[in-house]
């Protein structure tokens, strides 16, 4: 949760009503909390079949994690999953704030990055604590 909020806060999103939440660290944390609370309510109210994935698992155990995602989606394994950068480059223009990262190898520098900003984030950790505990961070 802390890395997710920090990443959203640090992105250069095109400003609109939704993205205005990411101009302030506390607003970013509150939005994360609200979205997770809503997701939890949906899970209780509806029969939702979903696959939960941690970014860290993709980074540190790519093949196993992607294999489980493909299995969930009832898709066969293909070694092409290792060539995601090539696929992204062949798509042409990518319209996301992280467009430059899509064509690069998966990297781990974002994992635990929030700890470098721990002092700045100390006020929002209590907002995120329920999710830190729930997701075992």
List where the protein language model places each region:
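PAPS-dependent sulfotransferases, especially Golgi type II membrane carbohydrate sulfotransferases
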Residues: 5-52, 60-137
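Acidic, glycine-rich loop-and-beta core segments that form the ion-binding/anion-interacting portion
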Residues: 2
């Amino acid at each position: 949760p802390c890395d997710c909020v920090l990443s959203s806060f640090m992105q250069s999103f095109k400003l609109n009503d939704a993205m205005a939440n990411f101009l302030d660290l506390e607003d970013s944390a509150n939005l994360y909390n609200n979205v997770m609370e809503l997701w939890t309510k949906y899970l209780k109210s509806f029969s939702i079949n979903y696959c939960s994935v941690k970014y860290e698992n993709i980074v540190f155990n790519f093949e196993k994690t992607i294999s489980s995602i493909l299995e969930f989606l009832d898709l066969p394994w293909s070694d092409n999953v290792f060539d995601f950068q090539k696929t992204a480059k062949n798509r042409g223009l990518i319209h996301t704030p992280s467009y430059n990262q899509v064509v690069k190898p998966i990297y781990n520098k974002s994992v635990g990055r929030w700890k470098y900003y721990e002092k700045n984030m100390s006020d929002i950790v209590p907002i995120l604590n329920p999710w830190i505990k729930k997701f075992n961070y």
